[in-house]
């Protein structure tokens, strides 16, 4: 990441995920728990595929994230229980340690390297959120 590491926000309790509404095309923001592993963020959809934000990600994986002092453009990927079994179990364990909860459908958020910036240096850009 430019300007630092996602590990610096690992202790934050929530992040703000913005997806593109699959029907309206409008930005949709949610507050959600997360964990960090290997410079990626992992979120858990409690209601699995029924979660609107997961449906939005399935339609358009381009997302934005605000966490701590960071604003990050990223790509989201819903993990597959079969092909991503080991990763699924690892991030669920990290979430269990952080929140005492790690159920739900994990979604991996991978920052777009050139677009990850520290909010202090892009304060004007936050008005677009």
Residue ranges and their predicted role:
Residues 1-16, 119, 125-129:
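Extreme N-terminal tail/first-helix region
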Residues 3-4, 36, 74, 88:
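Generic signal for short, ordered secondary-structure residues
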Residues 5-7, 42-55:
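Covalent nucleotidyltransferase core used to form phosphodiester bonds in nucleic acids
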Residues 12-46, 63:
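Short beta-strand segments
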Residues 24, 73, 124-128:
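Portal/gating segments that form or line small-molecule/metal binding sites
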Residues 48-123:
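Short, structured beta-strand-loop surface elements
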């Amino acid at each position: 990441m430019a300007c630092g590491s996602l590990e610096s926000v690992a202790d934050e309790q929530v992040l703000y995920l913005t997806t593109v509404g699959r029907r309206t095309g409008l930005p949709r923001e949610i507050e959600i728990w997360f964990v960090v592993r290997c410079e990626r963020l992992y979120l858990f959809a409690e209601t699995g595929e029924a979660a609107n934000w997961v449906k939005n990600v399935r339609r358009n994986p381009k997302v934005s994230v605000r966490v701590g002092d960071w604003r990050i453009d990223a790509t989201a990927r819903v993990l597959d229980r079969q092909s991503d079994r080991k990763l699924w179990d690892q991030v669920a364990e990290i979430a269990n340690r952080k929140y005492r909860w790690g159920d739900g459908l994990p979604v991996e958020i991978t920052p777009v390297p050139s677009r990850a910036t520290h909010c202090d240096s892009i304060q004007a850009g936050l008005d677009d959120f």
